[in-house]
Amino acid sequence: MAEMVARLASERAVVVFTKSGCCMCTAVTTLLGELAVSAAVHELDREPLGKEMERELARRLYGSGGRGGPAVPAVFIGGSLVGSTSKVMAMHLKGELVPMLKNAGALWL
C-alpha cells in the first residue's frame, strides 16, 4: 500500500487525499482552488482500497501506530507529505505555502 500511496502522491504537483463530507478536506481543497492550484483529489471513501490507503496515510502522519488524529486531509506537495489541515493553514498564514507551491510547479505566479 505504501507504494500505491507514493505513486498517487506523485501524480501531480499537489495531491490531496480526502473523504467526501469532510469539512476540513473541503477547507483545504477550497484554499488550494482559490490559489489556482489544480490538485489531484482522491476521495478515500470512494476508492476500492480507500481503507487501506487511509491506514497508510495515518501511519505516515502519526508514526507506526497510525494513531493521533484523522488521516484526511493529507496534502502532498511535490510528492512529499506536507500534513493535514492545521499544517497547510499554518503555512499559508506564515506565507510559506505559496513559495512551496511555486517550487513544486503548482503555481506560475
From Swiss-Prot:
Q: Motif Responsive for interaction with TGA factors: list the residue ranges.
A: 106-109
Location of this chain's protein in the cell: Cytoplasm; Nucleus
Keywords attached to this entry:
Cytoplasm, Disulfide bond, Electron transport, Nucleus, Redox-active center, Transport
Keyword check for Disulfide bond, yes or no.
yes
- Name a GO CC annotation attached to this entry: cytoplasm
Keyword Transmembrane found: no
**Chain segments annotated as coiled-coil in the UniProt record:** none
Q: List the disulfide bonds.
A: 22-25
Which Pfam families does the annotation name?
Glutaredoxin
Start and end of every Glutaredoxin domain?
A: 2-108
Signal peptide (from-to): none
Similarity comment: Belongs to the glutaredoxin family. CC-type subfamily.
* Main function: Has a glutathione-disulfide oxidoreductase activity in the presence of NADPH and glutathione reductase. Reduces low molecular weight disulfides and proteins.
Give the protein name, as stated in the record: Glutaredoxin-C13
Q: Which species does this protein come from?
A: Oryza sativa subsp. japonica (Rice)
Its gene name is: GRXC13
